[in-house]
């Protein structure tokens, strides 16, 4: 397979991932599937727009560039005859690096969100992040904490500390975990294109010379 054809496959894979990441980020603005009355009730990491900006908007640009590489002929790229195939592959490296940065940003935001937990209505009728500010551990009985992990990721009994929205911990973990995994996949795909682009820029694509009819498709 030519470098351009392989890049097109990567671009096709990035598009649905970017759409899913945007969708997950939008759903996070509705904790537990509910419309909140105060924006302060939304988990802070949601406002960093990791899925919308990092894995969404920034990922569209490299995806479109990867898709266009297959259509570049051997004499030029994007209709410009002064621009060769190797320059097109070199340009894709820059956009692939941009994709890695965007996916990395989304990955870091998602990892922090999973670690900190959601904002919810605590048992003392205050909206807070009980798993991050230590509030939940004040409710934890001594003997219970001795024999059960105090990290909410491992001790599901702590999830009951969140009264509202209903099922917010599951909602939070599911969506941010999806963003975590998908952003990691995006970063890997873009990193692969960096290598593919280097090969294409140094060695050239596998298509024939300008005007050749026996080049690879």
What is each PLM-predicted segment?
Residues 41-42, 136, 217:
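Low-complexity, compositionally biased segments
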């Amino acid at each position: 397979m030519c470098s351009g054809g392989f890049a097109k496959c990567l671009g096709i894979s990035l598009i649905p991932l970017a759409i899913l990441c945007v969708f997950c980020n939008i759903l996070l603005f509705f904790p537990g599937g509910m419309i909140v009355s105060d924006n302060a009730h939304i988990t802070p990491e949601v406002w960093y727009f990791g899925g919308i900006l990092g894995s969404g908007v920034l990922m569209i640009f490299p995806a479109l560039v990867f898709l266009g590489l297959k259509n570049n002929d051997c004499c030029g790229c994007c209709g410009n005859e002064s621009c060769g195939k190797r320059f097109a592959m070199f340009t894709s490296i820059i956009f692939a690096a941009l994709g890695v940065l965007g996916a990395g940003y989304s990955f870091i935001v998602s990892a922090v969100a999973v670690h900190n937990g959601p904002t919810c209505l605590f048992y003392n009728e205050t909206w807070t992040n009980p798993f991050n500010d230590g509030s939940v551990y004040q409710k934890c009985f001594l003997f219970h904490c001795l024999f059960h992990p105090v990290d909410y990721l491992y001790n599901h009994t702590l999830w009951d500390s969140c009264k509202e929205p209903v099922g917010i911990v599951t909602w939070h973990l599911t969506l941010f975990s999806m963003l975590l995994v998908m952003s990691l996949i995006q970063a890997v795909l873009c990193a692969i294109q960096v290598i593919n682009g280097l090969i294409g820029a140094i060695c050239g694509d596998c298509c024939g010379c300008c005007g050749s009819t026996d080049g690879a498709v």
